[in-house]
Amino acid sequence: KNSRKAVFLLQQTWEQRKVNEIFKVTRGQVLAASLTTPKKNRGNIYPVYSSQTKDNGLLGYYSEYLFENAITWTTDGANAGTVNFRPGRFYSTNVNGVLINENGYACYAVSEIINKVAYKYVSKVGNPKLMNNVMAEINIMITPDIDELKQISKLIEAYNQYITLHQ
């Protein structure tokens, strides 16, 4: 069954698509916090993201990376369903799901689109969870125009930098 549904929004046609129609849906790996350093150094140059919200999920730095330019979301705990774009190379712990797309869809704009709806799919029975199979089936409205997504992403990134400067 095709979940595409075209609508007219702004100047472009946007489509309703399932996350797994756009992204490879995967997960990070276990990493002991003791193997990370709080600051970059010669050996540990890649950011490590976890499920925490402190420092935008930054746990520390590590010598290896698993992903590059991808979207993460918190799978378990109080912050389950929190979605972020991670630019550059990074390591993601096992309490994060990861969305991978090599064609430009992994960006700030799409992470915000998903973040606006992901909370609705968090299972709140016991420990809150948003598992890979559930994330994969979430429907989002998205433009197929990568240039439009890049422009929206630039605005979001500039806005985020402005907020960071004034905190």
Briefly describe each language-model feature range.
Residues 34:
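Conserved sequence/structural motifs within the catalytic ATP-binding
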Residues 41-43, 65-66:
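A generic fold-level signal
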Residues 115-118, 160:
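Short amphipathic alpha-helical signal-transduction/dimerization elements
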